[in-house]
Amino acid sequence: MCGIVGFTAPGQDPAAAKQIVRGMADLIRHRGPDGEGCYADGTAALGHRRLSVIDPAGGGQPMLNEDGTLVVVFNGEIYNYKTLRARLQQRGHTFATDSDTEVLLHGYEEWGRDLPRRLRGMFAFAVWDRTRGTLFCARDLFGIKPLCYYKKGETLLFASEIKAFLAHPAFEKRLNEARLPDWLSMEYLPDAETLFTGVYELPPAHTLTWQAGRVTLARYAAPRFRAKRGRSLRAWAREIGDAVAESADAHRIADVEVGCFLSGGVDSSLITCEMTRRQPAVQCFSVGYAEEAYSELPAARAAARALGVPLTETTVTAEDFFAANRAIQWYLDEPMPNPAEVPLYFLCRAARQRVKVVLSGEGADELFGGYPLYRQAVWAERWQKMPRAVRRALAALLPGCGLLRRGALPRWQRSARANYVFETTQERDKYLKRDYRAPTPAQRCKPYFDAVRGLDEPTAVQWVDWQTWLPRDILRKADRMSMAHSLELRVPFLDRQVLAAAQALPRRYRCTGRRGKVALRAAAARRLPPQLADAPKRGFPVPLADWLRQEKYYALVRAKLTGPVAERFFDTGALCALLDAHRAGKTNAMTKLWAFYCFIEWYEVYFTGKIPPDL
C-alpha cells in the first residue's frame, strides 16, 4: 500500500517539477513512510510514498521499464501477480524485481489499456508513456483504492488523496458549495464530484487517459447480477464458502505479518476463521467503549475464544472521540459524518503497533444483501404488487406508516440512502442559509436506478450501493482511517472470485423480507459455531447521542454551531434549537448534529488553516 501523485504540464522544467511533485507526495507521507521517489521530464511528473509489504528491497517507485519509455506509480496489491508474471515471462519479458509493481509495468507493455481487466486485487496506478505522450490511470473494480484528479487547461493533477493538490501551484482550492445540500442529505456525494470544485474521483472500474491536454474516461468492467436458478442453498453455501476461503488465502500474500479485525459479527469471524487455517495464532483487533451497551468488545472476546486467536482490545472514550475528529477530517479529504470512522481510526492505530497489514470484512453486506435497506426493498416491492384497492385501504388505515408512504413513490425515490440524514429536502433546507435550488438527492441517484430497471427492487438497490455507497462511504472510510496510521487494510469479500458467486445468487438467497445474507450465513455455518454464523449485524455502534447530552460536549458542539463557519452556511438559530431538543430528549438528532459539526471542523481544517499541528 502506498500513496501516488503526479501531474502533466507540457513544457515544464523537470527540476522544478520534481520539487513540486515531491511536495505533493510529502502531504500524503502517512500512506508510505518507508520510502519515497519521484520522476520528472518536460511533460509529466510522478511521485510515490511507499509502505513496503511485498519485496521490500526491490519494489521502489516510480519504476521504469528497461528503455525508460514507461514510468509507473502504483498503490495497492495485485493478488494474481505471480500468475501474470509467469505469463509475461513466457512472452519474453524479463523481471528485475519480485514486486507486483513490475508486473504492471510489463503488463502494460504487453496488453496496454486491457491490463486492468486482467488484474485481481485492489489498485490505483498511473503509467506515463513517454513515446506516445500518454498518461494512463486505472482504478480497481470496487474502488477499494482511491484516485482523484483535477484538470486546468493542459495540466492534469492526480493523487491518492485530494490534499496532495494543495502543494501544486495550478490548484485553485474552492468549496463546491452547490453540492452541500446533497452532502448534508447523504453524508457523501453519490457521483464522481467532490466538495472541492473541479476535483473528481475516478470511478471504480474506470480508466483515465490524458493525451495532448485531453482527458478521456472509459469503463473496463460492469458487474451485473445474473441469477442462476435450480441450485439449492446448500450448493450455494459451498460455492460461496470456497470462494471466500480462496480469497482470504490470496489476501494473505505479504512479506510482513498479517492480522485481522474481529468484531464478533459473521463477516469478520468468517475471514478470521479462514486465516487461522494457515496462520493459527493470527493477531486480531477490536474496538469498543466503556459504555457496554454500545461496545462490540464482549462479542469480539467471545469470537476470539471460539476461534482460538489472541485479541488486542482498544477502548475509545468521549474525550478521545472529540479530540481526534479534526485530524480525522484532515485524513478524510472530504467531510464524513459517519461516527463509525472514529472508532475505526483508533482500531487502526492499535493494529499498526503490532502488524502492517490487516484483513477486514467490508463489502459483505453490499455483495450478499446484509443491510436492512434491502429487506425494506423486499417489502416495498411486495407492496407495489398488491391490488391498488388494497393499497388504498391500508394507506388510509395506517396513514403514518413510512413503508406505505415510501411504497407509493417511484423506485428511485424510495431509496433510503438518498435521505439518510434528513427524511425530506424541506427538513434539510430549513437549516441552510441560502436557497441552492439543487436537484434532490433522489434525483441525483435516479440515473443509477435507470441503469438497472430490469432488476427486482432489492437487487437494484444493492447494485446502486455498489456504485455509490460502497466506494464513496465504506471504502473511503476504510482506506483513509487505515492509511492515517500507515496500515494496509485488505478486504477479501471484495474480490473478483467472490463477486462472481455473489452476482449469480438468486435474490432469495441474498435477502428476504426478514433475513439478510442468507447464503453467506449458510456458508459461515459450515465453518463457524452457530453463535458466530448467526450473529446479528452491529456495525460500529457509537454512544454519541448520549455524549451530546452531557454538558461538556453539548457546550463544545454548541460553540461550533454558533461560530463563524456555521454563520456563513447555516441558520445557527435552527441548529441550536435542534441541539437543545436533542439534549432535552425530545428527539434523537445525533446524525444531523454530527453532520453539521463534521462539516464545520472539515471546513476549518481545509479553508481556514486550522490543520492539527502534529500531523
Residue ranges and their predicted role:
Residues 1, 167, 197-204, 214, ...:
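Adenosyl-5′-phosphate
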Residues 1-332, 344, 348, 526, ...:
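Cysteine-centered catalytic environments shared across enzyme families
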Residues 141, 346-404, 469, 474, ...:
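Active-site adenylate/phosphate-handling loop in enzymes that bind or generate adenylated species
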Residues 329-330, 372-379, 612-614:
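Short secondary-structure boundary/capping segments
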